[in-house]
């Protein structure tokens, strides 16, 4: 559990993932806000002329949410690396 006196912005990604996995929606929202720019950066190369860029961004967000829910901090990857892989995999599929 998150101690009440620690602001969310001071928590690590790994701690926020653990909180989100236990049902803490605020922790999940914080991670989505923290990684919004990464999603947009990953989606940018796939924008097509005449296509809807928001559709790609939404697919990337689905990948980010999957990363938040499935991240296992006992593995060797830090969250950002895992999130980027999940986002790109979602964009490719």
Predicted stretch roles:
Residues 1-93:
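Alpha-helical promoter-recognition and RNA polymerase-docking modules of transcription initiation factors
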């Amino acid at each position: 559990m998150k101690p009440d006196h620690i602001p969310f912005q001071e928590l690590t990604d790994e701690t926020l993932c653990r909180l989100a996995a236990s049902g803490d929606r605020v922790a999940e929202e914080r991670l989505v806000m923290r990684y919004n720019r990464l999603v947009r950066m990953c989606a940018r190369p796939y924008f097509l002329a005449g296509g809807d860029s928001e559709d790609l961004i939404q697919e990337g967000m689905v990948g980010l949410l999957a990363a938040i829910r499935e991240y296992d901090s006992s593995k060797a990857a830090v969250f950002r690396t895992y999130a980027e892989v999940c986002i790109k995999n979602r964009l490719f599929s």
